[in-house]
């Protein structure tokens, strides 16, 4: 480090570890077809002020360590002048609000996108009576219901983040859908966030299949 280079305000060792964790998991999700056409974004809490997050516009199945950048909880790049996803604020608002959240995953599977369109009018999908509801942290029985919010899509992330915050003031959430877009899910760590993501995917798929079998919407 020369005299004009300031030290980085985060651990590069920890960033290296998280980059490998993110890349390995993202590659699996990409191979499942949940991140088409460079879509989707993924992050992990780095420390009390920073998050590691995927850069914008990269094929998520072919990420390398240089494609993982650092942002502060205002969504601003730290360390390297890279461009984070336009949806970075939807990640950082969760880290800022909930110190226990360690990982946020955003995917665009066909199931998630179709469900978000079908239920956009009601603004919510009610998942009830499924054994897999126990996959969500804190749930211990199938005799419960989880409501998945469906927010209108917008390119104004400040507006969308405010809408998410307002709903978080009223209810517990493990994730939400954006109309015609995809799913956000989170957890205390990568394993929990993936469990929540996979549970949502399975349960939404079940709901769509039930609609087809019933011949109703």
From Swiss-Prot:
Cofactor(s) the protein requires to work: Zn(2+)
Highest taxon, organism lineage: Bacteria
The record's free-text note on cofactor binding: Binds 1 zinc ion per subunit.
Record field: catalytic activity: 5-(methylsulfanyl)-D-ribulose 1-phosphate = 5-methylsulfanyl-2,3-dioxopentyl phosphate + H2O
Residues given in the record as Zn(2+) binding sites: 106, 108
UniProt pathway: Amino-acid biosynthesis; L-methionine biosynthesis via salvage pathway; L-methionine from S-methyl-5-thio-alpha-D-ribose 1-phosphate: step 2/6
Keyword Cell membrane among UniProt keywords: no
Keywords of this entry: Amino-acid biosynthesis, Lyase, Metal-binding, Methionine biosynthesis, Zinc
InterPro entries found in the cross-reference section: Aldolase_II/adducin_N, Aldolase_II/adducin_N_sf, MethylthioRu-1-P_deHdtase_MtnB
GO biological process, one term: L-methionine salvage from methylthioadenosine
Role, per record: Catalyzes the dehydration of methylthioribulose-1-phosphate (MTRu-1-P) into 2,3-diketo-5-methylthiopentyl-1-phosphate (DK-MTP-1-P).
HAMAP family: Salvage_MtnB
Family: Belongs to the aldolase class II family. MtnB subfamily.
Protein name: Methylthioribulose-1-phosphate dehydratase
